[in-house]
Amino acid sequence: MGKIIAITNQKGGVGKTTTSVNLGACLAYIGKRVLLVDIDPQGNATSGLGIEKADVEQCVYDILVDDADVIDIIKATTVENLDVIPATIQLAGAEIELVPTISREVRLKRALEAVKQNYDYIIIDCPPSLGLLTINALTASDSVVIPVQCEYYALEGLSQLLNTVRLVQKHLNTDLMIEGVLLTMLDARTNLGIQVIEEVKKYFRDKVYKTVIPRNVRLSEAPSHGKPIILYDPRSRGAEVYLDLAKEVAANG
């Protein structure tokens, strides 16, 4: 049975989608069967894997709102072993449409149960908010990876996220746990980055991954080419660190 991991932080611009795409691709690269679920209305994980959103006829919206069969929505990607459930801007209306729906928080969980046995890992790219889409992701997941940018105010807003995780644990998913905290966008030339690492480690202790994602030009270029870094530039520092992260995640089971 596949392990379901939500990549979430309600703060935007912390490397959430970059991590979802590249962790998923690197897990696939080391031989794991991976499904990436894009549950962010911006659909950046979808386009980051080379899928034209304009060509997507059905997406995760249809699963959440219309109970579409998840098997019909899954698309293969250019990465061997990596499939995706795409998102389009249509998803932006889903939170409002789900409000009157019975069991609205568990719709993604129910859908993924039908395909969980087909994958080693299911990675969910969450939107930068703590609304119903993120609640669906947390309810469906075994664990959470929290990307934290190595910048000033890095920990700002995390107490709200952790409180949401606790509420989901209490009411919807008692088994949900923090998988790990990932430090992203490190500029090793600055003292600030080092200070943030120390602060985050002090707060989260052994939950902080050994792998730290640096700022990397090739990593930021890859999405515009519709490729994860392992395909776009496999020899880059960005590919190297996400491969290290994939191995860390795989070692955790």
Swiss-Prot record:
Effect of D40A: Increases replication initiation, many foci in cell, no septal localization, complete colocalization with Spo0J, nearly 60% of cells have >2 oriC regions, decreased interaction with DnaA, represses sporulation in the absence of spo0J
Reaction equations catalysed: ATP + H2O = ADP + phosphate + H(+)
Compartment(s) where it occurs, according to its Swiss-Prot or TrEMBL record: Cytoplasm
Main location class: cytoplasm
Keyword vocabulary terms for this entry: ATP-binding, Cytoplasm, DNA replication inhibitor, DNA-binding, Hydrolase, Magnesium, Metal-binding, Nucleotide-binding, Sporulation
Protein origin, superkingdom: Bacteria
Binding residue positions for ATP: K11, G12, G13, V14, G15, K16, T17, T18, P214, N216
GO cellular component: cytoplasm
Knockout-associated phenotype: Not required for sporulation or for chromosome partioning. Cells initiate DNA replication early, 2-fold decrease in sporulation. In a double soj-spo0J deletion DnaA transiently arrests for longer at its chromosomal binding sites, not just at oriC.
GO molecular function annotations of the record: ATP binding; ATP hydrolysis activity
InterPro entries for the chain: AAA_dom, DNA_Partitioning_ATPase, P-loop_NTPase
Function description: Acts as a spatially regulated molecular switch, capable of either inhibiting or activating the ability of DnaA to initiate DNA replication. Monomeric ADP-Soj inhibits oligomerization of DnaA on single-stranded (ss)- or double-stranded (ds)DNA, thus inhibiting DNA replication initiation; does not disassemble premade DnaA-DNA filaments. Decreases the residence time of DnaA on the chromosome at its binding sites (oriC, replication forks and (probably) promoter-binding sites). Soj forms nucleoprotein filaments in an ATP- and DNA-dependent manner.
Subunit organization: Dimerizes in the presence of ATP but not ADP; ATP-binding is required for double-stranded (ds)DNA-binding. Interacts with DnaA.
Record's protein name: Sporulation initiation inhibitor protein Soj
